[in-house]
Structures are given as structure tokens and as C-alpha cells.
């Protein structure tokens, strides 16, 4: 497990990727670019089907987008989450946006009249409240998982840490999956810090 706290304006994710940790915790101010860096990397790998650093071919090139509540993974909200991404640059002009349809995430493009065409599937959404539902499903192409705003001031789920670990186990199926847990605030009341005995984080 790697914990990365940065105070500079923008995150450089390449150093984090070299650690090859399963769980990566990114903490910092809301505007310092940690979400941007993770989203850019995951979208790049999803399109190119290659490792972001080594450019080696990846079979698990898709990503999972995790939130606590099902209401947070509605299609409109997921699309808005990726609105700040330079999709045209990442996809070399093939697509211009990201959309979510029935829980799956796709690249998409628009013609001159604004008509939308859904492209290839690049990911899937997950709610921690529905981990039991996912257990019977297969996610063999997902290699990255984004858990946005894992620190909250509005309350955690009962057994939330177990739910997350169960979900990751369902996705990974004995293979390596990289999880990026992004937190915008530091709260001493965080079950992840307690469960994983991250005492030094709580004191900072």
C-alpha cells in the first residue's frame, strides 16, 4: 500500500506507478490535480491498451469507477466527472467525450450536428452498497479502479472497508488490480485508516 500526499499544484503520477502497489491512497487539496492525473492515466490505458509507463500490452486495460452510493454513479454524474479530460488528445482525435450507459463507461464522439456515437467500452461503475450484486459477474478486463472521495464527512457504510475489499477481490479474481483511493480532506474518523492501522496518516 502506498500513501501519497503532495502539496504542489499538480500531481505527478509516474512515481506512484513505479511502486506497483495494489492500494494507492492519494491525499491533498481538492484542486491539486490528483483526480486529474489518475483519470488521465486510466483513460490513456483504456484507449491504448498499454501500460502507461512501459507501453507494454495490457489485457486488463479497462477501469472501474467506485463510489459509496448508487446515486453517485448515475450516467450524467459519471460523464460530468470526466468532462475535464482532453479526450481528443488521449484518443488521437477518435473520440471527444466519455459517457455512461447502463452502468458501463464508453468513449463517444459527436458529429457536426451534435449527434452522439457511442464507441468502445472502457470501464464500469460500482457502488459499495451493491457489492453482493457484483459477485456473480466477471470483470476480466478491468485493471485499474478509481475510488473517488473515499474520505467523507457525511458518514460511512457499515463494514465499508470489508465491502471495498470484497469488491476488489471480485474484480481481480487472483490477478493484480491497482486501486486509486482519492481523498480531498483529512479526517481522523476514517475506517480505512483504522482498519489498515494507518496511524501516521491520522496524526498529520
Q: Can you describe what each PLM-predicted range is?
A:
Residues 1-204:
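Phosphate/NTP-binding elements of NTP-utilizing enzymes
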